[in-house]
Amino acid sequence: MPATGITLPSPSGPPLPCSAAIFVLDHRSRLPWPFPVSPLLFYTAALAFPAISGKNTMTSSANTTSPAIAETTWLTDQRILVLDFGSQYAQLIARRVREQNVYCQIVRHDISAERIAELAPKGIILSGGPNSVYEEGAPKCDEGLFDLGIPVLGICYGMQLACQALGGKVDNTPSREYGRAMCEFTDRDSIFRGMQESEQVWMSHGDQVSQIADQFTAMAKTSTCPYAAIRHNERPVFGMQFHPEVTHTPHGGQILRNFVIDVCGCDGSWKLGDFADAAIESIRKQVGNKRVICGLSGGVDSSVVAALLYKAIGPQLSCILVDNGLLRKNEQQIVLEEFSNHFKTDLHIVEAEDRFLADLAGIDEPQEKRRRIGHAFIECFKDEAAKIEDAHFLAQGTLYPDVIESGADKDGPAATIKLHHNVGGLPEELGFELIEPLRDLFKDEVRRLGLELGLPEQLVWRHPFPGPGLAVRCLGEITRDKLVVLREADAIVVEEIENAGLYRETSQAFAVLLPVQSVGVMGDARTYDNAVAVRCVNTDDFMTADWSHLPYELLARISTRIINEVKGVNRVCYDISSKPPATIEWE
């Protein structure tokens, strides 16, 4: 179809290198949440993973190694590495470091000291983990990293590991600490500069350091943990039993800033604008004069990918929109409007509702729904891509959490936790080379990048939508009639929250069609109709979430409108479950 609209401005000047980055070492982060991704890219299939019982509980439960993330050449000037030993919050460490305008990368825990030396990070962070350092088979790091002269910060399991490696002792303790604790800082220089004598921190451990080597000095303590923080007297090695990366440690961000800026010497000048310039230049070099296909959905991830590609190669970009019948109300129209307003290139629309619904007929098991949706999408995308001449590259909205969760590993084997729709989703026989310009970014960074690229705020700040679309919000078997009910109810939820001025104040809001019916009275007649649940949450990172405390008046308007305007609904419930123990999506 012909495309109209404005052309995004091209970047001026040479790409600027990133100036600061930090690494986190990773044993294997099994995250309990799927980062929401575009429904028109590729399906997510969660794989079964055995749980481990561990002593340090602020962790995931995976006993496998995590990926060593492929090095990105334009992010190598200054960085911090995070070695992940299984913490579910390894990504949170990286995000907190990046908030200091310092680039941070997560790598597997067993990366060699030689490889670290080649990467030349400004600092290293050893994450928490579910194991006990004194148990056989517990994940270790290459102890040679302590001899590199690079500053090291160990958190929880990472502190215990560093302490043990350098002559200390770690034991299980009967006085376990879980939750908030008051910490007394006895040494408020270097990493604890600016802290009060006593501050709240977040603890989650059953093991702790029982003895430190002579070369170490205690920096902090709690009522039950004499070595809540330590430092080496001769080497730039620090450890803390508490978790500075979580919001329950109110001044944890300051602690991490002290480490990466003051101790590691990063200058805090990494900017997304630099990232965009470098990414555009990288795309131009990779693509040359060939054509690129991009799956477009109207979500922020695919839109930012398209914006980067368009600024880099202009009319060499072709986009495909697969309408699978599982989209939100007026989704296709919204995509077309946004596309025509911001890109001047061709868009291919595949009308595939009948095909998807036929494949889903009679299926009520969530994982089987995902599998069938993924298979149907691949076939539709493959058929349409074959119609585009000279297409050589496929662009995907892969994000950094997708890469970590899927075990995408350049330097060694890694177990796959989730078969992510954005990581190797299309079959190899398509013959495309992949372009993944966002694979180093978190969701919040993608949003900021979208604003840098000139995308409208209403697009950049749209709430995330799950990969399988409304299929995971329509519990039980999916039918066309059920989707009509759900789509209308969902639109009312979003519209009322927008009218109340609370859309940007909430992280995700939607309706769920429950697989039950309930008795009601409408007029003078008995009804036996559908029940709808309303889900609205607030979160900074989608790893944990609280239910949104919406005003009663707003909830009443939502309920009244759904019951009055959506045929076949006589009951509306509000989901007040937090994550954990519940997940954000119902399936």
Curated annotation (Swiss-Prot):
Keywords: ATP-binding, Glutamine amidotransferase, GMP biosynthesis, Ligase, Nucleotide-binding, Purine biosynthesis. Its EC number is 6.3.5.2. Residues 270-462 form the GMPS ATP-PPase domain. It comes from the Bacteria. Pathway: Purine metabolism; GMP biosynthesis; GMP from XMP (L-Gln route): step 1/1. Coiled coil: none annotated. Residues 79-269 form the Glutamine amidotransferase type-1 domain. The active site is at C156 (nucleophile), H243, E245. The keyword ATP-binding applies. This is GMP synthase [glutamine-hydrolyzing]. It comes from Rhodopirellula baltica (strain DSM 10527 / NCIMB 13988 / SH1).
